[in-house]
Amino acid sequence: GDCLLIRCTFPKDKPVEFLFPVRLAYEPIKTATHLSNHGIYLKKHEVVTVMDYMIKWGTVMSNEIEADIIRNQMGWTDDNRTSFVIGDREYKRDGTVAQTPFSAITDKIGKHMIPKGTFEDWKKAANQLDTPGMELHQYAMLTGFASPLMAYTNTDGAIVCLTGETGAAKTGALFSAVSIWGNPKVLYVHAKKGGTFNALKGRISTLHNMTYAHDEVTNLDAEDVSELSHMISTGKPKLKMQASINAERDFESSASMIALFTSNKSIYDKLSALKHDPNGEVARIIEFMLGQPKILQTDLNFGKRVFEKIGRAHV
């Protein structure tokens, strides 16, 4: 339903922005609860006044301006690829750029895709990969640019896995691809046992066409690696039933991207240990073995350091 984008300033604290569903303006308790969740505390008699205020503003704006569309995914907005969402901006085919409010789904990652730094700074960082022995690191960076182009192909998704021992700058290569779209230190996923697999699926769905970067998939269970490979290559998760009733769960949004993994050990070997014939999964993954380039023998953090504080290439 329709929402109002609320910006509230406080005497001491930082301003906050959030979406207020207009339907809540007809229910005092839900209005008060929603506002209190964002640090706005009202007395009982003030709640009705605020409700009236929200309804009036909603009416005025619906009569005077066209509503912005809240997107639940980054990347292409439709099958015709008429516009592309990055953070809170929607870049349209006609050259215009529209603001798009974050939804509850995109808020956690969208705010880390706000343009910062300069393209010149990013190019300087990227050009440091133009070093003998770092050709595969360059390739990994270019998967970040190639990921949105998967929507133009007959293949929904692909996985590139960088495998090698510690010190091969695998994470630096990962950062280089993610830095195209936003802050790599926040947007990449580091695998640890006990993580929520549903959260990983949600991240893939939200990124939609941007590179999904997963560091150290060695720490994932083989079953999870198998399911991730299926989901990324087909563009959607497996069908599952609802827990309480005999019915399929609601449709989950699809994705079309290139995912970038890193691993200390061969991901092919990991899948082979899971089943006798892992060819279905192996066919979905391209694995490259990385050695340690000479430059990293004296500077182990070269790749990661270069990309962790730079601008965004998409601007």
Regions found by a protein language model. Give the residues of each.
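AAA+/P-loop NTPase substrate/partner-engagement loops
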Residues: 161, 173-225
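A short helix-turn-beta junction within AAA+ P-loop NTPase domains corresponding to the substrate/partner-engaging
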Residues: 269-295, 306-307
